[in-house]
Design a protein with these regions (language model features):
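A short catalytic or substrate-binding loop motif that flags glycine-/basic-rich loops and adjacent residues
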Residues: 199-203
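N-terminal membrane-targeting hydrophobic helices
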Residues: 1-198
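Extracytosolic and intramembrane catalytic regions of membrane-associated proteins
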Residues: 192-193, 204-374
């Protein structure tokens, strides 16, 4: 979820309280506390760290009390002895923990995936109920904050909207998934891993992704749906990344392992020549491949046109690899494909690892484990 929505949700939560510290800092501090978990980006310097840290430990349920404590210490005006109607420190701590939980809620209902079980698991929770930027969620919150004076009932309604609207999206997602499965089953198609994603203006537009086995291999299909779950455009087809290949690459590289855990139904295509390594590896039969997933697109033509206008518009999250048959490299008989070089590039944030040698996964140190690094 975008930071404006996070901050607005915190402001609404504070304004909905019947009693709050009588300081002009009360609402801004609540807004900042609700947006604060995204400060994990401050500690990111490489694409791999972006995948491991963003929506990572600062979004973890286990770390929530600690982050809440740090935020409570920063919210000194709320528990300062000279503040009229001040709260005790424990109450401020409870508030900041609630703001962190509110942030986590608004992230898990999107499609990105949030690692709420760190440091015990890197599993990403995604409920696929709300598009990553949803004006139907954000604008009512901003309007309520603007009209807040002596309107606590309005604030309570806005706070309820923070939960009711995303929860409704999650329910609609489940309904659309059941509709799509029934339709494809009636067409006698061999599909698996069907996933419904919210599109822009998601109560009215959705996207369905699924894998389909065909004689020429496994494909990933994508189709835009209307509010009634009916297809509104022809399917688009992409070559699925073979699971055996992704597993082999994951065993050979912590970068590949992390990327494929992040993706949803990854697809594969030959790499564009301009993105290939400048210096050849010299290995016979080497080939360059691009992996990505389809979560961050849209089935709406006007939305795609808007997305194409953003600076450095491209596939948002890309894994490029140079691979060769294992027999082309002596002593590499344990895998069908040998990973020679790799590159992570995230176009929107302009993060690029450039071509580098893979690093084999290893058990993390205690410090790395605690913060979710590998």
């Amino acid at each position: 979820m975008d930071p404006i929505t996070h901050a607005a949700s915190g402001a609404v939560a504070m304004l909905a309280l019947s009693r709050r510290p009588l300081t002009r800092w009360a609402v801004p501090l609540a807004a900042l506390a609700a947006a604060s978990p995204d400060l994990d980006l401050v500690f990111v310097s490489t694409p791999l760290q972006f995948l491991l840290l963003h929506r990572g430990i600062t979004h973890s349920l286990a770390a929530m009390p600690i982050l809440g404590l740090l935020l409570a210490l920063c919210c000194y005006p709320l528990w300062r002895s000279t503040t009229p109607g001040r709260w005790n420190f424990g109450k401020v701590w409870l508030l900041t923990c609630a703001m962190v939980l509110l942030h986590i809620w608004l992230d898990v209902v999107t499609t990105y995936g949030t690692m709420i079980f760190l440091p015990f698991s890197h599993e990403r929770v995604r409920l696929n109920g709300v598009f990553i930027i949803d004006l139907l969620l954000t604008l009512p919150l901003l309007w309520a904050v603007w009209r807040w004076r002596r309107k606590r009932g309005l604030m309570l309604l806005a706070l309820a909207w923070v939960f009711v609207y995303p929860a409704t999206g999650v329910g609609l997602n489940a309904w659309h998934a059941a509709q799509a499965e029934a339709r494809l089953r009636a067409e006698n198609r061999q599909v698996s891993h069907l996933t419904v994603l919210p599109d822009a203006f998601s109560p009215f537009f959705w996207r369905v992704l699924f894998e389909e086995q065909r004689p020429d291999g496994m494909l990933v299909r994508e189709q835009s749906l209307n509010a009634l779950g009916r297809p509104r455009a022809p399917e688009t087809t992409h070559q699925a990344a073979p699971s055996r290949l992704t597993e082999e690459l994951s065993r050979q590289s912590v970068t590949c392992e992390t990327f494929f855990q992040f993706t949803l139904l990854p697809v594969m295509t030959p790499l564009r020549p301009e993105d290939a390594p400048k210096a050849p590896s010299g290995v016979q039969d080497a080939q360059n491949l691009l992996f990505y997933d389809l979560r961050f697109g849209s089935g709406l033509a006007f939305v795609r046109k808007i997305m194409a206008l953003r600076p450095h518009a491209d596939i948002p999250f890309q894994l490029m690899v140079e691979v060769a048959p294992a027999q082309a490299q002596s002593g590499a008989e344990t895998a069908d494909m040998l990973l020679l070089r790799q590159r992570l590039r995230f176009s929107d944030s302009r993060r690029d690892s450039h071509w580098q040698l893979p690093r084999v996964p290893r058990p993390p140190s205690l410090a790395e484990w605690l913060v979710g690094l590998r």
